[in-house]
C-alpha cells in the first residue's frame, strides 16, 4: 500500500495521450526498475564496469540478477552485494524488504551458468540436450534448495538461462544405475561359457551336469 506523499522509485514504461492530456504509465514490477536501482546503488554498474547480463523476476517475491565484468580486479557479485550486503539491501529496502534478490555470476558456458543460477543449491551436475533442456542432478540434501518454495528457484533459474530445467536427485540416479549394473552382471554370470564346450551354460544346465557326475 502507498501513502500520500510517500517517495517511491518507479519505472516509466510509457507516456501516452489520454482524454485529459498526457498519461504517464509507471511500473514497479519491471526488470528495468531493478536495473535502475542497481545503477543508483552500485557505482560499478552505473559506470559500466559491472554489467547486468540477465534478470528473472517475480516482483514482490524473488529475483535473480546475473552480473559480469571483463575488467581485472573487479568482483561483479561482490560489487553489487557491497560490504556487509549494504548495496543489495538498499535495493531490497526499496521494495519494503519483501523481495529477495539473488546476485549470481554470469557465465557464457551454459552448464556453468545453469549451475550457478540454481544457487543456493551446490554441487550440481548439469547435462544438456539439443532441445535446450538441462537435466540437473542434485545431491539429496540440496534438492529442496534447488527446487525452491513452490518451485520458485528452479523456475527463476529457467527464465534467467533460457533453458527448461529438469531436476533429479543424484543419489536416486546412482541407485538406479547400480541396479542396472547389478542386473547386467547377473545376466553375464548366468551365461558364462562351459569349460568343456565353450558354449554358454545356464545355472539349470550346470545343475544337470552336476547330477550326471554324481
What are these regions (language model features)?
Residues 1-214:
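RNA-contacting regions in translation and RNA-metabolism proteins
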Amino acid at each position: 500500500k502507498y501513502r500520500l506523499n510517500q517517495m517511491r522509485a518507479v519505472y516509466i514504461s510509457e507516456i501516452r495521450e489520454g482524454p485529459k492530456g498526457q498519461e504517464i504509465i509507471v511500473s514497479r514490477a519491471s526488470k528495468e526498475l531493478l536495473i535502475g536501482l542497481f545503477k543508483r546503488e552500485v557505482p560499478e554498474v552505473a559506470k559500466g564496469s559491472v554489467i547486468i547480463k540477465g534478470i528473472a523476476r517475480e516482483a514482490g517475491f524473488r529475483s535473480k540478477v546475473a552480473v559480469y565484468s571483463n575488467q581485472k580486479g573487479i568482483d561483479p557479485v561482490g560489487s553489487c552485494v557491497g560490504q556487509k550486503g549494504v548495496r543489495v539491501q538498499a535495493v531490497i529496502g526499496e521494495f519494503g524488504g519483501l523481495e529477495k534478490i539473488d546476485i549470481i555470476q554470469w557465465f557464457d558456458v551454459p552448464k556453468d551458468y545453469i549451475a550457478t543460477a540454481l544457487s543456493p543449491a551446490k554441487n550440481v551436475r548439469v547435462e544438456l540436450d539439443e532441445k535446450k533442456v538441462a537435466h540437473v542432478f542434485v545431491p539429496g540434501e540440496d534438492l529442496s534448495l534447488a527446487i525452491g518454495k513452490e518451485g520458485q528457484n528452479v523456475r527463476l533459474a529457467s527464465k534467467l538461462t533460457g533453458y527448461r530445467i529438469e531436476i533429479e536427485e543424484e543419489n536416486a540416479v546412482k541407485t538406479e544405475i547400480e541396479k542396472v549394473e547389478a542386473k547386467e552382471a547377473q545376466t553375464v554370470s548366468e551365461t558364462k561359457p562351459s569349460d568343456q564346450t565353450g558354449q554358454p551354460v545356464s545355472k539349470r544346465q550346470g545343475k544337470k551336469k552336476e547330477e550326471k557326475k554324481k
